[in-house]
Curated annotation (Swiss-Prot):
Gene from which this protein is expressed: PROK
Organism name: Parengyodontium album (Tritirachium album)
CDD domains per UniProt: Peptidases_S8_PCSK9_ProteinaseK_like (cd04077)
Keyword Nucleus assigned: no
Protein's name according to its UniProt entry: Proteinase K
Statement: the UniProt record of this protein carries the keyword NADP: no
Domain Inhibitor I9: 39-104
Cofactor binding remark: Binds 2 calcium ions per subunit.
Length: 384
């Protein structure tokens, strides 16, 4: 879809009031990951009136792919070079960023152990100890490939609430697996939480940053319509190259009253170069294995807040089945579920959950931790 702006947006348009011009063009940020051709995210300045965004949209011939009004004001659309130039001159535009590809952070392997580890001070245990409140009254949004809500492990507590594709069905399995680690009956950390699926990735586990932002924008609004008296968590087991707009959206979702847990990434590299992992205000999760080693694939660096079990994690899968896979994608829902569990107990809030989890973590237990990276492993501190 190619968008064009009516001449009334241009200062030289005859008979029309000129749009105030800026002294220099708004920044155009190049994608650091795999670029989506001619696709852009346009972010309006903080404090810009929604009416300014709406007025600009009315002057566009065609419909944007996404309009953002919650995590920030802006839109995503296919634009030609001239349109980008016009929008960069708009006084209310903060920046324009090229859209990029985002993918799941998972890989295949075998066997369950993560639940036992987050309720123990040492590795090698086989029992998960937890308070029977188990996250009841909390809600967790799984922003992913969808959730197979009919899976018996979810006991009717899961539902799909938004999709950006032709179908809301999870045709991949990744989202269902993550949701299972958050809150399924057998494999979940918070076994009584409500699970809401937001499908932002396709059945190949791939998507675009503009759609990820749309999903976060949706959650920032939708949470107000849900009954979640103990708190709201969002789990994002996905990522790509660094993106200012994705980080901004994640930060705003966090500040809106949602605990945001994100995957550090599977590149065995510094997470500061990836998004949303590099956003400082969200909870960035690295992966560990059953022997308390940093998983060989896990990203690291100063932006990490916590590690969670991420190698060979057994959980729910599509078709009413189960599967064991690995990735920081698997570590993230452990922490998201733990946040929901702790919020139900009144131990913390969405605003402080990541810091609380870090403060009460098992400290110094992990090996293969690079310099400058936290050595903290998530722990529920359950006392029988």
């Amino acid at each position: 879809m190619r968008l064009s702006v009516l001449l009334s947006l241009l200062p030289l348009a005859l008979g029309a009031p000129a749009v105030e011009q800026r002294s220099e063009a708004a920044p155009l940020i190049e994608a650091r990951g795999e670029m989506v051709a001619n696709k852009y995210i346009v972010k309006f300045k903080e404090g810009s009136a929604l009416s300014a965004l709406d007025a600009a949209m009315e002057k566009i011939s065609g419909k944007p792919d996404h309009v953002y009004k919650n995590v920030f004001s802006g839109f995503a659309a296919t634009l030609d070079e001239n349109m980008v130039r016009v929008l960069r001159a708009h006084p209310d535009v903060e920046y324009i960023e090229q859209d990029a590809v985002v993918t799941i952070n998972a890989a295949q392997t075998n066997a369950p152990w993560g639940l036992a580890r987050i309720s123990s001070t040492s590795p090698g245990t086989s029992t998960y100890y937890y308070d029977e409140s188990a996250g009841q009254g909390s809600c967790v949004y799984v922003i992913d490939t969808g959730i197979e809500a009919s899976h018996p492990e979810f006991e009717g507590r899961a539902q799909m609430v938004k999709t950006y594709y032709y179908s809301s069905r999870d045709g991949n399995g990744h989202g269902t697996h993550c949701a299972g680690t958050v809150g399924s009956r057998t494999y979940g950390v918070a076994k009584k939480t409500q699970l809401f699926g937001v499908k932002v990735l396709d059945d190949n586990g791939s998507g675009q940053y503009s759609t990820i932002i749309a999903g976060m924008d949706f959650v920032a609004s939708d949470k107000n319509n849900r009954n979640c008296p103990k708190g709201v968590v969002a789990s994002l087991s996905l990522g790509g190259g660094y993106s200012s707009s994705v980080n901004s959206a994640a930060a705003r979702l966090q500040s809106s009253g949602v605990m945001v847990a994100v995957a550090a990434g599977n590149n065995n590299a510094d997470a500061r170069n990836y998004s949303p992992a590099s956003e400082p205000s969200v909870c960035t999760v690295g992966a560990s294995d059953r022997y308390d080693r940093r998983s060989s694939f896990s990203n690291y660096g100063s932006v990490l807040d916590i590690f969670g079990p991420g190698t060979s994690i057994l959980s729910t899968w599509i078709g009413g089945s189960t599967r064991s896979i690995s990735g920081t994608s698997m570590a993230t829902p452990h922490v998201a579920g733990l946040a929901a569990y702790l919020m139900t107990l009144g131990k913390t809030t969405a605003a402080s959950a990541c810091r609380y989890i870090a403060d009460t973590a098992n400290k110094g237990d992990l090996s293969n931790i690079p310099f400058g990276t936290v050595n903290l492993l998530a722990y529920n501190n359950y006392q029988a």
